[in-house]
Regions:
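C-terminal motif of bacterial Sec signal peptides marking the signal peptidase cleavage site
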Residues: 5-9
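Short cysteine/histidine-rich metal-coordination sites, predominantly Zn2+-binding motifs
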Residues: 80-88, 98-106
Length: 122
């Protein structure tokens, strides 16, 4: 393994930026496992994504993998932000870094609603 291969993916602060993730899944909003999405501010975690209902008609989906060192991030409905427990990184609901060591934004996925089926794709 070459030195370049070892350093590939490392950021200037010693973290690593996870590779872009490809997702393509659906959530049935009538399923009990997705009942949190019936309420504005509700969220579910599925398929390496956090899916949040932000308004009556709007859902967002972001990667749940921190861009610093790959830890799993969590959504705080009270703070309305996304938090990494490993080193305190924070992101807004657009995936942008708002604090801490993450070197880049979270990957944002597309959402589309057809009846009670929410589709999430990269």
């Amino acid at each position: 393994m070459t030195g370049a291969s070892i350093l590939e993916g490392c950021s200037k602060n010693g973290g690593s930026t996870p590779a872009t993730v490809s997702v393509n899944f659906t959530l049935d909003l009538n399923a009990s496992s997705n009942s949190a999405l019936k309420t504005v501010g509700g969220y579910v975690e599925s398929n390496n994504a956090i899916v949040i209902r932000t308004t009556t008609n709007t859902y967002i989906a972001l990667s749940n993998v921190c861009t610093h060192q790959g830890c799993t991030v969590s959504y705080s409905s009270q703070a309305k932000d996304i938090y990494c427990p490993c080193h305190g990184g924070t992101y807004d609901l657009n995936g942008n870094v708002t604090g801490g060591p993450p070197p880049s934004a979270l990957q944002v996925f597309k959402t589309s609603l057809n009846g009670n089926i929410l589709t999430v794709t990269s």
